[in-house]
Amino acid sequence: MRAEIIAVGTEILTGQIVNTNAQFLSEKMAELGIDIYFQTAVGDNEERLLSLLDIASQRSQLVILCGGLGPTEDDLTKQTLAKFLGKSLTVDLLASQKLDRFFASRPQFARTPNNERQAQLVEGSIPLQNLTGLAVGGIVTSKGVQYMVLPGPPSELNPMVMEQVVPILSNNGTKLYSRVLRFFGIGESQLVTILEDIIKNQTDPTIAPYAKVGEVTLRLSTKAENQDEADFKLDSLEKEILALKTLDNRKLKDLLYGYGDNNSMARTVLELLKVQNKTITAAESLTAGLFQSQLAEFSGASQVFNGGFTTYSMEAKSQLLGIPKKKLQEYGVISHFTAEAMAQQARQLLKADFGIGLTGVAGPDELEGYPAGTVFIGIATPEGVSSIKVSIGGKSRSDVRHISTLHAFDLVRRALLKI
């Protein structure tokens, strides 16, 4: 079904409010398998709204109007739609009764004739009752086009959509099902290059790549009658994607760390630690506790994490972790030695299964001859100690610190999965 959204309100055009309704409606329509082709904002002007309705009626099967249902003269959405369709306005009994109760309980407010506009419906509409406000919404069909009228305030529109509109539109058949794949260790441009043939020939399911700070996600989407049908199609596409290799011959499946919009590398590692009944600690320099903070964001962190160290200076590394100061001076604070020593000492001091050490140059200035973005990360496990050097160039100080923690979590993930 082709659909479009028309947001009515001069305040949107003047920038006084942000049109969050369009985002919410687009997301919900996509979940129902309804394609939003156009989004438009128009002021409180009958002539311009009539012109827009004329265009919408010729190109869309569903036209969603939000805003302009209030009691004032510039709230003209229902009145203009009725004029466009050549229909009259009627009064919805339930909405009118709600107005009665509202003013009966508030004798200090005068009930003017304009208030009755909120209970009006375009003739022939299916009413959409407003559970949190006074203005009734509605759905009316004319010449094969459905027109949906919704209130403007999100506190009124959102529950109306979730509790009334979604069940009505769910009867249209297919819905949109999505699966999000999360990758670390590959950039968006390389991933798109690898997937070029699949993306070029895609119809259904589809692939949409998104770049985030330090990671990339792929949203796989398909239209299907039910979850089982969707899973069959998405499983097939995912299998095809994960069978590919990167330009430097790494397995793409090894770079997939999780699924879902709300997942993260920290959450993935936390769950792996819990499943394997392992514990972790960290000693952090440039990240200053960010690794530990991200781990502790999730419920159940105390099962795997007892504490850690923030050792920003050379003195703190020596005093808190027991790393000989002469060794730190010999190898440098920014080094494989220091990262490994931090990881090993933290692990031993807190008797954890895994220890992480993070040291490097967050920027913007260089340190010990290393440019900003140079990071050494050590990992200590029951099998031994190792470290990696990563270069995170061209990023802000905040991004360098965040991406450093992603690399650290990925080291732990790979150790747990023995990749």
From Swiss-Prot:
Family the entry assigns: Belongs to the CinA family.
Coiled coil: none
Domain of life: Bacteria
Identification of the protein by name: Putative competence-damage inducible protein
Organism: Streptococcus agalactiae serotype Ia (strain ATCC 27591 / A909 / CDC SS700)
InterPro entries in alphabetical order: CinA (IPR050101), CinA-like_C (IPR036653), CinA_C (IPR008136), CinA_KH (IPR041424), Competence-induced_CinA (IPR008135), MoaB/Mog-like_dom_sf (IPR036425), MoaB/Mog_dom (IPR001453)
Classification via Gene3D superfamilies: 3.30.70.2860, CinA-like, MoaB/Mog-like domain
